[in-house]
UniProtKB/Swiss-Prot annotation:
The lineage of its organism: Eukaryota, Metazoa, Ecdysozoa, Nematoda, Chromadorea. One of its GO terms (biological process) is formation of cytoplasmic translation initiation complex. This is Eukaryotic translation initiation factor 3 subunit H. Its main location: cytoplasm. GO terms for cellular component: eukaryotic 43S preinitiation complex; eukaryotic 48S preinitiation complex; eukaryotic translation initiation factor 3 complex.
Length: 379
């Protein structure tokens, strides 16, 4: 969890996010270059960078005017001192960030940090590291956001950039470090309202607006002729999405089992404490009747309550639920956009479906044969 112990600076006034087209192009270029180079598999972390801009108080708008990528961690080799290398990497990363902000200031570019961006396939960005980074930003900058870029949808022709921030209740609970089931229930916090999604508006220059208007006037024929050789590649991405969804369901099932065990242990603990309190109360009444001093309840109050065995309390189950919802939303959208249910089964599960129908036919044939043999024996 985040180690920040400061209080929230104040409620955010931002209601939507405005992104310059320059920022969009830099994010897309950065992510595509690293994904084609295979750096995600080597470094084992998301492609990310920092956002700079300003807050328009009158319009209640967060303007993101520029961005720059952050340095990646180099892979550890055998025999290296991990702690020393991590400290050196963090110092180098901090120095590069300050140097870039200094250059922005010298060039009269907005250099105020307003958040960060990350690239996550299918928009499944809900991880502990992302939450910790949001806590760090929003504890000092209440209007800070994270932009989540989906490279899979973008390659299929749909630019996907979404802006998130922690809700006020989620930020307060994160700063307190208390994600127990009782605290989340009292705060009314669920995986649906843990993060707030802000509307995103992309600001283009006048020349770009003119070009888009001309493209709109040309009609669909020219676009269809120029894109007839393109392929959406939905089949492969949907297969990866379903595999990730299966992993999310397994993780979610594990957290649900841990919560179920916690509920049973908590009920058993409450019953034990209640019985002990009632027994001590009756014993004290008898002692008072005999003129003896009553016994203390401190030993009963010191009984250790059960703890949720997940890593970060209810936060882990919230993250698993959000990831599963992101993957299921993408799968549902892809199926509705490109496939009927029958073609979806034929495209992705043709071998398994064929084996299933074959096994069913074999079972039916054996069943009918056994039934016929039994009837013949009766005759």
């Amino acid at each position: 969890m985040s180690t920040i112990s400061a209080t929230v600076a104040g409620p955010s006034i931002v209601q939507f996010v405005q992104i310059d087209s320059l920022v969009v192009m830099k994010i897309v270029k950065h992510v595509d270059s690293e994904m084609y180079a295979g750096l995600n598999e080597v470094a084992g972390e998301a492609c990310q960078g920092l956002l700079t801009g300003l807050v328009s108080i009158d319009d209640r708008r967060l303007e993101i005017t520029n961005c720059f990528p952050t340095a990646r961690a180099e892979p550890m080799l055998d025999g290296d001192e991990i702690a020393q290398n991590n400290a050196f990497y963090e110092e180098q990363k901090q120095a590069e960030m300050l140097d870039m902000l200094r250059k922005f200031r010298d060039m009269n570019i907005d250099y105020e940090l307003v958040g960060f961006y990350q690239a996550h396939p299918f928009g499944a960005c809900f991880a502990q590291e992302t939450i910790d980074s949001l806590i760090d930003y929003q504890a000092s900058v209440p209007d800070g956001v994270v932009l989540i870029y989906d490279p899979v949808k973008t390659r299929q022709g749909q630019l996907s950039i979404r802006a998130y921030r922690l809700s006020t209740k989620a930020l307060e609970m994160s700063l307190d470090g208390d994600w127990s089931p009782e605290s989340t229930r009292t705060a009314g916090l669920t995986y649906e309202n843990m993060l707030e999604e802000l509307p995103v508006v992309i600001k283009n220059s006048h020349l770009v607006n003119v070009m888009l208007a001309e493209l709109a006037l040309e009609g669909d024929c020219a676009i269809q002729r120029s894109s007839s050789h393109l392929e959406l590649g939905t089949r492969r991405s949907l297969e990866k999405c379903l595999r990730s969804l299966m992993s999310d369901v397994d993780d979610l099932n594990r957290t649900v089992m841990a919560y179920t065990k916690y509920v049973a242990d908590k009920q058993r603990y409450d019953l034990t404490v209640y019985n002990a309190m009632q027994k001590r109360q009756a014993e004290n009444e008898q002692r008072e009747a005999r003129g003896e001093p009553p016994l203390s309840f401190d030993d009963i109050k010191k009984m250790k309550p059960p703890q949720l065995t997940t890593k970060c309390g209810m936060l882990e189950s919230f993250l698993c639920s959000s990831d599963a919802r992101a993957h299921s939303d993408y799968a549902a959208e892809a199926c509705l956009r490109h496939f009927s249910f029958s073609s979806f089964c034929l495209c992705f599960f043709n071998e398994n479906i064929a084996k299933l129908f074959l096994a069913e036919a074999v079972v039916d044939s054996h069943g009918s044969r056994d039934h016929g043999g039994a009837a013949a024996s009766v005759r």
